[in-house]
Amino acid sequence: MIEADRLMSAAAVTGEEVIDRAIRPKKLEDYIGQPHVLEQMEIFIQAAKMRGDALDHLLISGPPGLGKTTLANIVANEMGVNLRTTSGPVLEKAGDLAAMLTSLEPHDVLFIDEIHRLSPVVEEVLYPAMEDYQLDIMIGEGPAGRSIKIELPPFTLVGATTRAGSLTPPLRDRFGIVQRLEFYQTGDLQHIVSRSAVCLALNITEGGAREIARRARGTPRIANRLLRRVRDFAEVRAAGHITDDVAVSALNMLNVDTEGFDFMDRKLLLAIIDKFVGGPVGLDNLAAAIGEERETIEDVLEPFLIQQGFIQRTPRGRIATVHAYRHFGLEEHGGDPE
């Protein structure tokens, strides 16, 4: 299964950008959740503005869908500067990055999503740019080649990554501010759903927002996607009114259970329980058993299941916890509770 095809995928889906921009908060005061990150960023941004400096380079890590791009937009808005956006895989050559850097105005924000996927040659260009606001460009080749330096205006690089451990130490060390976004609590997600409903002019009750929030896997992107699908259901079956009962019926129809698990989550957990007697099972064997890439399991499926206590990672492999057995009404080792 392609990850982007999953309703419960935290990955961005083509076509959602327009709606996401409409409901995305623009200021720190509108950003819900992540209180420690917000408190720190408010201080860092205010201090930089008071000094008249560019904000220190910022690295934002965390699972997909938690608001890394939103936070980058907010940083630019709060600093009152332009935001230039790109991603690691897009910057194939050093010249691609050089072109973006030389187009920046003083204190602008350059946002690089998936920064862990930068090629080594592009990353080398970043080092002097981040540290000294300079570009080192080679003119010519061989013995006749020479290096010239191009001065850059002070700017802020905001890098986003789902795999902070994959960044090289020289790159990671050049970020003055490092923030990690965590999965959201249900209460914060409920506020996000309610806010998005207002932006989209939807009729939703507090109970309806809470039901969507508690099945959204701690992820705002999923919560907003579920809200749109529940809206469709409500418009056809409930005159557009999203109550808790309507939300429950819609989400059950979409095969999203009370824990926010979809088919792939249940497939992963049941593979560990049934095919590997609860584990431990190695990642490669587990990937083969469910027909998924190991990276998809590590980066997409596992984080939420581990955070919620349904899977444990051990030196010998993955283990299904007692919570996983109880979720499926099983005793440990896959026996029937009756």
From Swiss-Prot:
GO terms under biological process: DNA recombination; DNA repair
GO-annotated cellular components: cytoplasm; Holliday junction resolvase complex
Catalytic activity entry: ATP + H2O = ADP + phosphate + H(+)
Positions annotated to bind ATP: I23, R24, G65, K68, T69, T70, E131, D132, Y133, R174, Y184, R221
Annotated Mg(2+) binding sites: T69
Enzyme Commission numbers on file: 3.6.4.-
Subcellular location: Cytoplasm
Keywords, alphabetical: ATP-binding, Cytoplasm, DNA damage, DNA recombination, DNA repair, DNA-binding, Hydrolase, Nucleotide-binding
Binding site for DNA: R294, R313, R318
CDD domains: AAA
Region (Head domain (RuvB-H)): 258-338
Segments of this protein annotated with the region Small ATPAse domain (RuvB-S): 185-255
Family indicated by similarity: Belongs to the RuvB family.
Function per UniProt: The RuvA-RuvB-RuvC complex processes Holliday junction (HJ) DNA during genetic recombination and DNA repair, while the RuvA-RuvB complex plays an important role in the rescue of blocked DNA replication forks via replication fork reversal (RFR). RuvA specifically binds to HJ cruciform DNA, conferring on it an open structure. The RuvB hexamer acts as an ATP-dependent pump, pulling dsDNA into and through the RuvAB complex. RuvB forms 2 homohexamers on either side of HJ DNA bound by 1 or 2 RuvA tetramers; 4 subunits per hexamer contact DNA at a time.
NCBIfam families assigned: PRK00080.1, ruvB
Annotated domain remarks: Has 3 domains, the large (RuvB-L) and small ATPase (RuvB-S) domains and the C-terminal head (RuvB-H) domain. The head domain binds DNA, while the ATPase domains jointly bind ATP, ADP or are empty depending on the state of the subunit in the translocation cycle. During a single DNA translocation step the structure of each domain remains the same, but their relative positions change.
Full protein name: Holliday junction branch migration complex subunit RuvB
